[in-house]
Amino acid sequence: MARENKKELIGKVVSDKMSKTVVVEIVQRKMHPIYHKYLKVSRRVKAHDEREESKLGDKVKIVESRPISKEKRWRLIEILERSK
């Protein structure tokens, strides 16, 4: 039975030097609990790119998946915007 509610994130490709793998940086805004100021919190995840179609600077959508390797738990779904 497949789980339907998998996480989807949008981020920017910051590295494409590995084969079939891209590093995606996800930037989120979180509010500080005391000072009520919004902070930019970023994290970098490795995502599987089977066809090696994304390039450095592309805006991509990734989805959570089964573990593909030691650090890869995300797959590339689509490229939302190409880099210039």
Swiss-Prot record:
InterPro entries attached to this UniProt entry: NA-bd_OB-fold, Ribosomal_uS17, Ribosomal_uS17_bact/chlr, Ribosomal_uS17_CS
Gene3D superfamilies: Nucleic acid-binding proteins (2.40.50.140)
One Pfam family it belongs to: Ribosomal_S17
Disulfide bonds: none
GO BP: translation
A Gene Ontology molecular function term of the record: structural constituent of ribosome
A Gene Ontology cellular-component term: cytosolic small ribosomal subunit
Keywords carried by this UniProt record: Ribonucleoprotein, Ribosomal protein, RNA-binding, rRNA-binding
Keyword RNA-binding recorded: yes
CDD domains: Ribosomal_uS17
Description of how the protein assembles with itself and partners: Part of the 30S ribosomal subunit.
Similarity annotation: Belongs to the universal ribosomal protein uS17 family.
Entry-linked PANTHER family: 40S RIBOSOMAL PROTEIN S11 FAMILY MEMBER (PTHR10744), SMALL RIBOSOMAL SUBUNIT PROTEIN US17M (PTHR10744:SF1)
NCBIfam families named in the record: PRK05610.1 (NF004123), uS17_bact (TIGR03635)
Family matches, as HAMAP family: Ribosomal_uS17_B
Job description of the protein: One of the primary rRNA binding proteins, it binds specifically to the 5'-end of 16S ribosomal RNA.
Protein name: Small ribosomal subunit protein uS17
Source organism (scientific name): Borrelia duttonii (strain Ly)
Lineage: Bacteria, Pseudomonadati, Spirochaetota, Spirochaetia, Spirochaetales
